[in-house]
Each structure stands twice: as C-alpha cells, then as structure tokens.
C-alpha cells in the first residue's frame, strides 16, 4: 500500500483535503466525493497496475515515458497526476485540464 503522506503531495491544499476533508477554492465542490475516492484508491494500491481498475480511471503513462509520470481521471476535466517510481507515488497533484475549443 502506498499510504499517502504529506511528502507524496505537491500541493498542501490537496493533502489537507485528503487527510482532513478541508475544502479549497481550487477543488470544485462537485469533485469532493469522486476525488476522495480516487485518492483512497491510490493510497490503497499495492502497485501501479491496481489503478487500471476500474476502467474509468483511464490510467495513462504520460510522455515522455521515461519520466514515469502517470495520470488517472477524476472526471472529464480533472486528472490526478503523479510520478510513480520504485513502487512509490510522488508529486501528486490535481490538474484542471484546460480545453482550447
């Protein structure tokens, strides 16, 4: 299990949301439940392949692949991005992807 701690998060507000349920202006209220669930999934995972299920996670290794940076979907707009190396999650953050339509 990864057992997420403060040092695994890039941003303090996301750690405080995960650990204490603190809200923040950077986290939309419609994300609270699903974001908490996704963070729990990451924390409970034994290895990176555990995050392939459910398929709605859309686990993806981002380019360049040698950087070992992954993303999982929170919803259509938001992803959790993190580095996975040596069976450890680091630099975990919430990314509000901006679409240029």
Curated annotation (Swiss-Prot):
InterPro entries hit by this protein: HigB-1 (IPR007711), RelE/ParE_toxin_dom_sf (IPR035093)
PANTHER family: TOXIN HIGB-1 (PTHR40266:SF2)
Name of the protein: Uncharacterized protein HI_1250
SUPFAM superfamilies: RelE-like
Coiled coil (residue ranges): none
Taxonomic source organism: Haemophilus influenzae (strain ATCC 51907 / DSM 11121 / KW20 / Rd)
